[in-house]
């Protein structure tokens, strides 16, 4: 009897283990504690506003691997491997065709590219890149990890798997993971010719056991957002299927919602469920829908505003969708989307409207993307709304998943002496981390006429910062991966400070600490400057510092920060060129933390 109970218990335990999903992404750099304020003045919430991090909540995002896989100047069938199509040497390419630029140049008679050719709706911040650009993939891994995205879901809905590109992404993610990064897992979404696509995907990726540690598992098995009907038993049993397509209300595919995960839906979105129809499993959140349905980024309260009233960067549609998702509070939020960027040009008359205006056969339309308003990408763009959607997404993710609290201490035990030995920093309580190995050079072909994108701006890999407060001073520590060139404080290394009591100044900061252009003896001076406008700084003092090898320490008298308020935000940035725009934090040199993010420190009330 005891043996029977033991066997039953073991089987029950094994069953429970088999139901486990992949762990949620937990940033080793504690990115969920970082502060940021976007170009619209919207600040990210922290633990006090969203509560503690919930390790049972998941976020996935639609990710696209097709950029360059269907040709450049004209549409082509994929090459046999379904990877990025090599460019022909010596060919005079005309693309990329950017619809927004085409319309700006010839609004009445747009000079589009050929029919069926892929057109960009706008320019990505990292340029018209190809999907196998490792430098871009690394930036995507960093941005999505910092945002708290648990899984990227590759779009293979058009019966093309793009396996070489998926493998390139996994190769980069795996390398970053070995460097100590937390990276999103991967999954796929199928639709057209789903049996053929799933068999190809299974044989080329899963059956071979490739990058198994990157597979996203949902309740015991690798997740496949697709249709299990008609598949061989071996494949049908291998995956946990969740059928996915567009819209829900009155849609036959969605039915009652059991095991259905839509990738786009009208507000208020319906949720998919698994065990119980009263227990939401998944809901979708999208930034917009389609130009041919006239549902853009500004659509809200049930209608699309007239053209002279849209505000594409404000995220009204996205905000409504997040509102619904947070009310439903499912296990999994699926976001559409990250980096689609292109759409085919059609003239066959299948669409009857574009942006609410009637069109007839022979006139141009684009189904999924058209311009800044009628597009769905969250990845930052060049110009336009910049990175607004990236931070709006993070706002929603934090409200859904929560965030870790900041370290608070009445007294920091460390006592700092600027002597270049750095042992006194070992007891510092406030330690801040950045990603290791994120200053690799870029040299990769771009789309069509763009021969190559290059970037060699990275020089000092910023790894760790510390902060110690006393009654009179704030002391900062920085460690880099390698020693500073020449053993001296480099030009271009800057510590930016933002206090909670003053309006933001240049680049959103009130003060900056950097090397002066003046040198006394052999040692460069360190100065603190105050922002006097959005573009101008004025020096207010010189500061003491010590530098040895790959470590730097400096102290700042609180006299220079009058009325700082309750908190301080700070950021280290290093590049050969000056940072003149917050967007340059994305691709110039290295920043700690990344992009617009800042580390946040709660000032000790006993020391204020």
Where do the protein language model's features map onto the residues?
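N-terminal module-boundary/linker segments of secreted carbohydrate-active enzymes
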Residues: 19-73, 213-215, 232-236, 397-421, ...
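Surface-exposed, glycine/proline- and aromatic-rich loop segments on solvent-exposed faces
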Residues: 416-525, 575-584
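Aromatic-rich peripheral "rim/lid" segments of glycoside hydrolase catalytic domains that contact
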Residues: 176, 349-422
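N-terminal carbohydrate-binding/catalytic regions of secreted carbohydrate-active enzymes
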Residues: 42-168, 337, 341-378
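The substrate-binding groove and active-site-proximal loops of carbohydrate-active enzymes
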Residues: 32-36, 118-133, 149-160, 184-195, ...
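Loop/turn elements at helix/coil->beta-strand transitions in domains of secreted/extracellular proteins
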Residues: 54-60, 147-152, 179-186, 211-213, ...
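Acidic/polar low-complexity flexible segments
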Residues: 408-413, 417-419, 496-521, 549, ...
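Aromatic-lined glycan-binding groove of carbohydrate-active enzymes
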Residues: 52-72, 222-334
């Amino acid at each position: 009897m005891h043996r029977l109970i033991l066997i039953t218990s073991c089987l029950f335990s094994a069953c429970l283990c088999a139901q486990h999903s992949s762990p949620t992404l937990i940033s080793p750099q504690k990115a969920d504690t970082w502060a940021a304020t976007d170009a619209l003045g919207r600040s990210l919430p922290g633990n006090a506003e969203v509560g503690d991090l919930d390790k049972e909540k998941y976020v996935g995002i639609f990710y696209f691997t097709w950029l360059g896989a269907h040709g450049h100047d004209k549409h082509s069938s994929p090459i046999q491997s379904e990877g990025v199509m090599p460019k022909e040497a010596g060919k005079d390419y005309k693309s990329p065709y950017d619809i927004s630029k085409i319309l700006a140049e010839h609004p009445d008679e747009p000079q589009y590219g050929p029919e069926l050719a892929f057109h960009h709706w706008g320019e990505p911040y990292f340029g018209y890149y190809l999907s196998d650009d490792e430098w871009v993939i690394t930036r995507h891994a960093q941005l999505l990890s910092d945002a708290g995205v648990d899984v990227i879901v590759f779009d293979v809905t058009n019966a093309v798997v793009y396996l070489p590109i998926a493998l390139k992404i996994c190769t980069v993610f795996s390398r970053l993971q070995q460097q100590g990064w937390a990276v999103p897992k991967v999954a796929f979404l199928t639709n057209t010719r789903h049996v053929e696509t799933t068999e190809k995907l299974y044989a080329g990726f899963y059956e071979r056991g490739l990058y198994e540690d990157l597979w996203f598992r949902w309740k015991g098995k690798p997740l496949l957002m697709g249709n299990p009907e008609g598949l061989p038993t071996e494949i049908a049993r291998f995956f946990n299927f969740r059928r996915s397509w567009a819209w829900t209300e009155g849609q036959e595919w969605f039915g009652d919602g059991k095991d259905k995960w839509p990738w786009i839906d009208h507000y208020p979105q319906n949720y998919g469920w698994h065990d119980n129809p009263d227990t939401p499993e998944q809901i979708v959140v999208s930034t917009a829908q389609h130009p041919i349905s006239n549902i853009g980024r500004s659509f809200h309260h049930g209608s699309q505003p007239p053209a002279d009233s849209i505000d594409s960067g404000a995220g009204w549609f996205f905000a409504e969708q997040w509102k619904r998702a947070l009310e439903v509070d499912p296990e999994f939020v699926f976001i559409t989307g990250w980096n689609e960027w292109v759409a085919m040009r059609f003239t066959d008359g299948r669409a009857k409207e574009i942006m609410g205006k009637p069109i007839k056969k022979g006139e141009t339309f684009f189904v999924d993307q058209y311009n800044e308003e009628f597009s769905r990408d969250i990845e930052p763009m060049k110009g336009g709304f910049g990175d607004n959607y990236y931070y709006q997404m993070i706002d929603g993710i934090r409200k859904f998943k929560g965030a870790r609290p900041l370290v608070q201490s009445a007294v920091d035990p460390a006592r700092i002496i600027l002597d270049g030995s750095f042992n006194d920093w070992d007891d510092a309580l406030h330690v801040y981390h950045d990603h290791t190995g994120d200053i690799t050079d870029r040299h990769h072909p771009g789309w069509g006429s763009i021969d190559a994108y290059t970037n060699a701006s990275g020089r000092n890999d910023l790894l760790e910062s510390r902060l110690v407060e006393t009654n009179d001073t704030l002391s900062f520590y920085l460690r880099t991966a390698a020693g500073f060139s020449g053993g001296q404080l480099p030009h271009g290394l800057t510590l930016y400070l933002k206090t909670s009591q003053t309006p933001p100044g240049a680049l959103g900061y009130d003060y900056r600490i950097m090397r002066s252009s003046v040198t006394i003896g052999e040692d460069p001076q360190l100065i603190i400057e105050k922002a006097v406008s959005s573009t101008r700084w004025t020096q207010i003092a010189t500061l003491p510092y010590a530098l040895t090898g790959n470590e730097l320490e400096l102290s700042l008298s609180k006299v220079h920060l009058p009325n700082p308020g309750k908190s301080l935000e700070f950021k280290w940035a290093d590049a050969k060129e000056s940072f003149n725009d917050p967007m340059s934090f994305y691709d110039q040199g290295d920043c700690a933390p990344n992009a617009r993010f800042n580390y946040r420190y709660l000032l000790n009330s006993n020391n204020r």
